[in-house]
C-alpha cells in the first residue's frame, strides 16, 4: 500500500540556527530554512530530513538518524576536528576513547548529538 511513497525523517530541535549551522557546516548537507520553523536537510539519495522548531523540545532518547559509512575511524577523526563530541558508553556496548564501539562480529558504531541533543550515529558494517 505505501511501497510507492517516499518516506522521510523528522524530529524537533529547540534552536533552529545552531541546528542549521551544524547540519550545514559540520555535517556538510544542504539546508534550507522554510517558514521560519522548519529546516529541510537534503540527505543522500534525495531523502529529505525535516527538523522543526519546538519550544518545549525534548531530545529523543534513541538514535534518530544513522549514517552508513565506509571508514568510521576516519570520519570520527574528521568530525572531532570540527568539534563533534562522541558519546561514551560502557559495557555491553563499550566505546573506545574516541567513542567508537568496535564489534568484531558486526557493525562498528559511534554516536553523537546534534545541537538539539538528538542522537545520531555513524555505522560501518
Question: What does each model-found stretch correspond to?
Answer:
Residues 1-2, 67, 77-125:
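Vicinal oxygen chelate
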Residues 15, 24, 39-41, 76, ...:
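A generic "structured core" feature
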Residues 15-16, 69-73:
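Helix N-cap motif at beta-to-alpha junctions
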Residues 17-30:
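Amphipathic alpha-helical segments
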Residues 18-19, 36, 74:
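Short Gly/charged-rich anion-binding patches and loops
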Residues 22, 61, 73-78:
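Short amphipathic alpha-helices within nucleic acid-binding modules
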Residues 30-63, 69, 87-88, 105, ...:
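Conserved short beta-strand elements that form part of the metal-binding/catalytic scaffold
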Amino acid at each position: 500500500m505505501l511501497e510507492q511513497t517516499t518516506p522521510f525523517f523528522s524530529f524537533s530541535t529547540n534552536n533552529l540556527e545552531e541546528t542549521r549551522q551544524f547540519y550545514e557546516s559540520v555535517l556538510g548537507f544542504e539546508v534550507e530554512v522554510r517558514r521560519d520553523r522548519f529546516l529541510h536537510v537534503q540527505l543522500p539519495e534525495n531523502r529529505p530530513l525535516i527538523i522543526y522548531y519546538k519550544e518545549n523540545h525534548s531530545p529523543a532518547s534513541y538514535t534518530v538518524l544513522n549514517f552508513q559509512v565506509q571508514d568510521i575511524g576516519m570520519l570520527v577523526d574528521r568530525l572531532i576536528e570540527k568539534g563533534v563530541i562522541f558519546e561514551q558508553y560502557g559495557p555491553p556496548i563499550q566505546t573506545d576513547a574516541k567513542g567508537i564501539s568496535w564489534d568484531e562480529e558486526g557493525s562498528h558504531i559511534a554516536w553523537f548529538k546534534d545541537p538539539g541533543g538528538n542522537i545520531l550515529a555513524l555505522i560501518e558494517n
